[in-house]
Structure formats: C-alpha cells, structure tokens
Amino acid sequence: MDSLAGLVLCGVSLLLSATVDGAMDLILINSLPLVSDAETSLTCIASGWRPHEPITIGRDFEALMNQHQDPLEVTQDATREWAKKVVWKREKASKINGAYFCEGRVRGQAIRIRTMKMRQQASFLPATLTMTVDRGDNVNISFKKVLIKEEDAVIYKNGSFIHSVPRHEVPDILEVQVPHAQPQDAGVYSARYIGGNLFTSAFTRLIVRRCEAQKWGPECNRICTACMNNGICHEDTGECICPPGFMGRTCEKACEPHTFGRTCKERCSEPEGCKSFVFCLPDPYGCSCATGWKGLQCNEACQPGYYGPDCKLRCSCTNGEKCDRFQGCLCSPGRQGLQCEKEGVPRMTPKIEDLPDHIEVNSGKFNPICKASGWPRPANEEMTLVKPDGTVLRPKDFNHTGHLSVATFTINRILPPDSGVWVCSVNTVSGMVEKPFNISVKVLPKPLNAPKVIDTGHNFAVINISSEPYFGDGPIKSKKLLYKPVNHYEAWRHIQVTNEIVTLNYLEPRTEYELCVQLVRRGEGGEGHPGPVRRFTTASIGLPPPRGLSLLPKSQTTLNLTWQPIFPSSEDDFYVEVERRSVQMNSDQQNIKVPGNLTSVLLNNLHPREQYIVRARVNTKAQGEWSEDLIAWTLSDIVPPQPENIKIFNITDSSAVISWTILDGYSISAIIIRYKVQGKNEDQHIDVKIKNATITQYQLKGLEPQTVYQVDIFAENNIGSSNPTSSHELTTLSESQAPADLGGRKMLLIAILGSAGMTCLTVLLAFLIMLQLKRANVQRRMAQAFQNVREEPAVQFNSGTLALNRKAKNNPDPTIYPVLDWNDIKFQDVIGEGNFGQVLKARIKKDGLRMDAAIKRMKEYASKDDHRDFAGELEVLCKLGHHPNIINLLGACEHRGYLYLAIEYAPHGNLLDFLRKSRVLETDPAFAIANSTASTLSSQQLLHFAADVARGMDYLSQKQFIHRDLAARNILVGENYVAKIADFGLSRGQEVYVKKTMGRLPVRWMAIESLNYSVYTTNSDVWSYGVLLWEIVSLGGTPYCGMTCAELYEKLPQGYRLEKPLNCDDEVYDLMRQCWREKPYERPSFAQILVSLNRMLEERKTYVNTTLYEKFTYAGIDCSAEEAA
C-alpha cells in the first residue's frame, strides 16, 4: 500500500512539476497592506505570452469567513496588458480589511496567491505579513501591541478561536507557539482585543512546507537545490521560487534595481521604485518586500550593509567590494559569488539566439531548436520549450556548438490546435530568459475526389488525377500518383505528375489496380495523406488461367496438379501449359503441355523433400495469362526430425502450455504429445495427436494438481514417427485448500434433511408429474404447429456429419464435425438466453482432457429457420478452421434430435457488457474521481479490442465469409482479454448474399446497401465494423441513440453519420468515416484497417481519452432501441 501511495504521489509530483514550469509568471502586488486614509490597491500581473484563462482577484473566504461580502471592482491595469487591479479610495477604507487572492489557470490547474489587508490603527500589528517554515520547525507567531486596553486578548486561526490572554497579562509582544509545525497548522492567524472585531484585527499567514528543511519530493527524500538570497525550495518540484529582484535557477542573479519577475522584465515605474509594494508569490514563498525595502509597509530602506527582500541579507563583501541594497555585493571584473569571494570569468545572463519570431510548419513530426548563449553555458536540464497549452517539453537532443548551447525538441505529431505562441526558456545560475515565438501549423493537403480513369488497355491506363478541390492548406508544391495491384502485398508505386492527365504504362494485363493522389505542400514533412482510392482492371491479352488450381504431394517424387474443367469461348484448339521449377535448384525447370480436355497432371521424376513452384496457363494460338504461383513439397523419404525448442509455460494446477518448432520439408502431418504421471507404467500414458502441423503450441488441460508429469513430443509424416524428444518434466501447481469442515453444522443439516425427507420426496414426485404433463402438452402443441408441413427435417444428423436441407439445385456434401459424447458434457450455469436459443457453461471432455466450454442449443419452440441457421453456424465454424480472433469450435453433439454446439468459453462475456461495466463513473464514482478516470480500460486496451476484431474479420474475408451481424454484442472477450468474433448463425459463404426473408434486422449496424437492397458483402461488414469501433470508443454507447429506425432509413442516404465521440481522436474517427462511405468499393479492406490500428498501437498515443474531465458524460444507452434493432 505504501508503494502504491508513493507511486500516486510521484505522479502528482510530475504533474505539478509540469504545471510549475509551464505556469504563468503570476505576481500579486499588495500596495500599503496597512490601510489608513490613503488610497490602496491590489495588482495581479501575469506574463502576456503564457497560456491562461483570465486572471481574477477576489476575497479569500476560505481564510476569513466573516469579512465583507461586497464584490470587488476589478479593472484592467492601464499600464500592463496582462494585469488586473482593484483600487480602494480613501472613503472606502472601512471595507478593506480581510484576506484576498489572485488566481490564474493554466491547463486546468489553478494557481492562487494569497495576501491580506488590515487597519493601520489596529490594536495589534503582525511581525510579518506571512511566515514560511519547514515541517517540524518550532514556530513563534508574534503580534506587537499597539493600543493598550483593559480587555482580554484573543487569537484566531482561519476565523476560529484558539487562544486567549487575560487582560492583566497581555504582553507587548503577543506570541503563539506552534511546536513541530505540520501542514495542518498553516492558515491565517489574527489577534485583537475581545471587544474588537474584524476591523481592529491584525493578520499574519503561516505557510508550512510539506517537507522538512532542504527536502522535497512525494516522500520528501530528495535534496533541494541550494536557493540563495532567501529563495524558497518548492516541496513538489525542488525548484527555487526566487524573491522579487532575483532570478535564475538558484536565485543567485540579481535583477537591475526596481525590476522583478521570473525574467526581471517587469518594472516598478513609480519615482521611488518598488517602495510601499508588498510582493506576494505562489506558496510556499508567501509575501515580502522587494529587494532593498523592509517593514510591514515596505517603505523603509535597508540599513547599510544589508540588502534583499525585507533587508534580511547581510552583504559581508570581500576585497572591499561595494554593497548595494538592491543587488548585494557588486563584484569587480574577475570576481564572482555572493560575497565576491571567488575568482573566475564573470557570469553572463543567458541570451536566446537565432530564433525567428514566426515559424510555419506542416502537421506531423516537428523538431524545433532553441539556441542560447551565456556563462556558464546553459546545460541540457536548463533549457525547456513551452507549448501554447502550457505543456513543458524537455530536450530530446542536446549539444554545444561554439559558444552556443543547442537544444532539439521532438513533437511526434503537431496539429493545427498547437498553433500559437510557444516559448523557449533558459534558466541558469546566471539568470533566466524567455523568448516567445509564433508557430503556425498548416493542415496537410488531401484531394477530396478520387482520380478518374479515362481509358485502359492491357498494359496502360489514362488517368485524370482530379487534384482539385482539396482539403487542407496550400500552396501545392508537387503531386504524386500512387498505384499498386489490389491483390499483391507490395508497396505503393508512385510517379511525379505535373499535368492533370497522365498515362500509366507497363501495367500487368487483366489485373485490378487501385490508385490515389498525394499532394505535397512546401516545407519539411509536406506530404499530405493520400486521397480517395479508385480501382480499375486492365484488359486481357489471352485466355485467363485455369480456375480452381490445387497442388498436392502424391508421393516422394510426384506432385498432383488439378484444376476445374475449361470451357473456352472460341472454337480454337487449346492446351494447358504447366511450368514447374525447384525452389532449391534454379536450373531444375520443366514445362509440360497438357491436352485441354484433361483436368489434372502428375508432375513426376521429382526429388524427395524438395519444394517446387508451379504455375499454369491456357494457350491457343496466343499465349494465355499465367496463374498465381503454387508452392508444395514432395513427400519425405525419411522420418521427420524431432520437434525443437520445446518450452513449457503458463503452468497452473490443472493445465500447462507446450510450444515447439518443426523444420520445413519433412511432410509432417501431425504432432503427437505423450504425457504420463512420472513413475507410472508406459502403458498409462495419454497421447494427444494434433493433425494441423501449422499449430506450434498446445494447452494440456485436466491435469492433476501438484503432480510431476513426463512429457515427450513426436513428429509424424508419411514414413513414420520421429524419435521422441528428450523427456521434459512438468510439475503442476498445488490446488487451493478446501473449505474447513463444517462440523456440527453439517450434522445439523443432515438431521434436518432426514426429518424432512418424506415431505421433500412428496413434493418432488408431484413436481415430476407436473413436468411430464407439461412436456407432453408442449410436444402436442409442437406437433399441431407443424402438422401441415410436408418437407423433410431442416437438419439431418448421421454419425458425425451434418446435412442441411436447403432449397437449392445441388445439395452440398454433408458437413463433417468433431463429435462430442453426450456423457462427456457436464452442464453448469446458464450464461445467456434469447427467444429461441440458450447458452450454458459446461465442463467437457475432449481428447481425454477436461476443459471449460460454452454450449449453445435451441429451445423447443424454435422454428425450422432457426434450426437451419443454428446448424449453419456449425457448418461455418467447421469450414473456417482455427483462428485466435474467432470463437473456435470444440465439438458438437446430437441428443434426442437436438444439436448441441460446444465452442470456446469466454470468461469475460460479450464485449458490449464488458465495455459498459468499465464505465466506472457509474459503477464506482469514488474510484473514478480518485483516479481521475472514466473507464477501467486504457486507450491501448480499447484499440487492442478493435485490432483483434479487424484481424478476425480479415481472416473471415479471406475465407470469403460474410458475417452480417457484426456488433459488440457478438464479440466475446476471452482469456488474456483477447477479442473473438462469435455468433456465425447469419454468416454466409458467398461473395455477395441477398437476403430474401424478413426478420429482426440489426438496422443500426447495417450498411446503406443492406438496408435498401438487402445486399450483403464484405464491404457491408466493413460498415458494421465502423459502428462497432464507435461502440468501443464510446464505451458501449447505443448507435444513433434517440433516433428511430425509420429516421435512419431517411437520414443515412442524405449523408448523416454517427457523430464523433467527445473522447475520440480525429484519426480514429476518420477511420470510422472511411468505413461508412456510401460507395462500398471506396471503403477500406479489413487488412487496411488492421494496418492503421497496428500503427496507432505502435505510436502509443492516447487515441481514446478515458481521463475524467470536467462535465464528462458517457454516450447514451437505449436498450429498447437495441432490442428493436
């Protein structure tokens, strides 16, 4: 717990450090704090270039509740642009007494400076207006008696009584002792006679640093910089707060007389300089006179030999150097130090060099440079850059060039909102200097329209690049036309263009290309984002390649190439040309001519264990187009080598994960994992056979706790099995202790159950009779409901095969699925339920291993269409195979005519509920406020969910499956918080699917073409993915909350889209908008979406802001609308 608190304090310290560095130079000047009949004022001054909200001056009711309530007349200071002022005329002297503050805000952080005013005719006067001490100091707060009265003296803290002195014991100096001061002792202390009031009270303010002397940090264990000239060490940052008249990292550098501020740029313009001005700075400094002045009114000059704020510093100059009451010892050339006690090169105030007043940059990466001179030369940690929002940047690179210190800063992504006044700041022992400069961030240009294809041939295309109009800033320096084949994983090619019409040459025949335009503006990083993509296909020059090509090993020296029958459109003679070449030996190449009426060819006389590349084309008098390359190995002539790199990890009390690697070229068809309890007979082992050789890890489940197992791994091919690997030991963890014996309670329970046994038995028998009657009634009603149906059953089962009776000309082959035995399923809890289906958690046994599973089944009232869709889900899962981002099939079971589908169990439920549970401001407001977060999920976790779904959908699209119901409710969150796509009941295996039946539709997730024409493609899945991404960013909000489905039908074709969530970065929302383009072919593919999300994850930028900010609200949830969809 202490470590956690330390981390939290450390985070707070870092935030405060950034705030102090980036804060405005805020100073409160209290003119004549002792009020008489003269005019008095408060002036609050801020640096003009600093980013801040308007500064304010007000009464400090936290310190004194019972002061005047009248609002202050705050006006703009006529002599300074960034200053506010309150002036009291002589006639309002009676309303002045009290505590006041000046406040400014930077990046939402408030900076408040406090001061007080009191009557000069008060009965007592404080020794000082403020007093700053370290934690643990012994403090005497003293008031000087001015008027003598026969009354008790009373002392208050923050308006509450704490102490009194009998009237005959009131001393000339009234003291309040605070031993071992702590932060809670800080506050405004006041003294008066008991018969007096606020207007006869004297005030002083005690400031207690959070740390002991010369310490700072969250745990007060770091040593402060040695602050000179009565500077104060800030307990949160370790930096020196310099008194008025001094500057620099250690406050050693004296300003010119009558100047003040962090960089000594402010000046007291009155004839007598800063006389009668009390300067108040942020805590823990408090208030003091400017250097050279002392007294409560700061109207007394320092005595000879003294200098500094309140004249508390003694010169003690060496070598007869002169003492100045404003600057201290004035050292002659060659001398330095507070007392001129050191020899050396005279110190020079830093100066910022070669920094232009205005810089124009392009959005993207930006590396500004600050150069500074001075002596000693500024160091790395002494140079900073302040953004317009107050963020302080440290140098990424630093070096010395001649007499200059050069600091290079890095902004990974600068955007137009970053335009404004930036400040280069240098703070050394020789002083501090800041120079503001203006940065104008330009938006990179992007064409609004896709290029137009004017003409195409088999190897060329004529393009109108349509570079105007464009979004963003000009002028345009150059233009690029980017293009590449659609189905090839290769980089974009580009050509520079000067005219609007350009010809692309040397293209591949009968190939689909995509192209777009990129505009470049002046300046570094001026390349804009590519514009909308246009696709086109070049013409053919010959017959297309054979369709359905397949290359499989036949023997150790033979490969079998097959294809679909060829039906050419012309009557010309044709043949199939097959080219075969070896990967290992470039010289081994053969071309074979196959008669056109054949659909296969055996490639003979090959070498065992060798990889070959094969392609084919259909030739007539002209040569046809080559097919894509097919690659296959011949079968091995030797047993495979042992699996390598065996690793066992993620060991629990009942499971462990084993991984391995295998060598290519040995025709490995299966991996066998053999394990047994150490010490048992060889015939008591368990074999797990993994027939997919591409799988390289497996989780053993159903192990006994705290048991040593012996594990061997074999590889198997057409020749036989490899030798086993050297045995590996696996020791499972111990199981958690069983609950303690209930003892007497258990016996009492048995007694109660025994005495009530007959009653329970009677109730049970009655219940069973009623259940049987109800079941008979249900069966009768079901028979009546379908008595007129003469069709065959929707689903037919037969020993591990599934046949769907569809109304089609050609019934497909039955689907083969992994069979589970009914007795190997142990049902546990219901975890989900709908109108016609139910999902239960179960413990199943598969391949001898026990594991958790989710079992899906249909209810008795489900229709034939529901049963057909459910069986279709099994068919889809069988065809899809295994992928980490889809819910994978474990097996299926037919029992009494019903299908039970076993899939992976996702312990964290569906993504929609998971997102809504993360809304911690609704579920645990105290935690949300304490941690300043609106969600238990980070930006990275949310983007990982989005990337997982995109990866799974890319796999589905490659398998040419359409999901049709992609939404957060149909995404499950598995182990290690991996998102997995589920609910394939509506999936189809065609490239384009037209829905012809009515039913409940997920309208809020459907693409325009699906709503209007009931057409579903992978592109319509992309639209749904964009809505799902919106659900993730909005933490489970309802899409189009507050709108009816009828309104959606009307507004979507008019260009209306989901609004950008407040916590969403522009780049993520732009990705959503791309998914919602009206023309399906203009939407990105899932592979492109995944590339964009992976780049965002690598940049580790906060693309989804889950920080709790002021007036934060979650996106709306309308469950009734979701059900209606």
UniProtKB/Swiss-Prot annotation:
- Mind naming one GO cellular-component term on file for this protein? cytoplasm
User: Domain named Ig-like C2-type: which ranges?
Assistant: 44-123, 350-440
A Pfam family (short name) is fn3
Record domain Fibronectin type-III: where: 447-541, 545-637, 642-735
Q: Which GO terms describe its biological process?
A: angiogenesis; cell differentiation; cell surface receptor protein tyrosine kinase signaling pathway; endothelial cell proliferation; heart development; heart trabecula formation; negative regulation of angiogenesis; negative regulation of endothelial cell apoptotic process
Subcellular location as annotated: Cell membrane; Cell junction; Cell junction, Focal adhesion; Cytoplasm, Cytoskeleton
User: Which stretches are Extracellular in the membrane topology?
Assistant: 23-748
As stated in the Swiss-Prot or TrEMBL entry, residues carrying the post-translational modification Phosphotyrosine are: Y861, Y993, Y1103, Y1109
Describe the PTM: Proteolytic processing leads to the shedding of the extracellular domain (soluble TIE-2 alias sTIE-2).
Record EC number:
2.7.10.1
Q: Which family does it belong to?
A: Belongs to the protein kinase superfamily. Tyr protein kinase family. Tie subfamily.
Description of its domains: The soluble extracellular domain is functionally active in angiopoietin binding and can modulate the activity of the membrane-bound form by competing for angiopoietins.
> How is the quaternary structure described?
Homodimer. Heterodimer with TIE1. Interacts with ANGPT1, ANGPT2 and ANGPT4. At cell-cell contacts in quiescent cells, forms a signaling complex composed of ANGPT1 plus TEK molecules from two adjoining cells. In the absence of endothelial cell-cell contacts, interaction with ANGPT1 mediates contacts with the extracellular matrix. Interacts (tyrosine phosphorylated) with TNIP2. Interacts (tyrosine phosphorylated) with SHC1 (via SH2 domain). Interacts with PTPRB; this promotes endothelial cell-cell adhesion. Interacts with DOK2, GRB2, GRB7, GRB14, PIK3R1 and PTPN11/SHP2.
Q: What is this protein called?
A: Angiopoietin-1 receptor
**Which organism is this entry from?**
Bos taurus
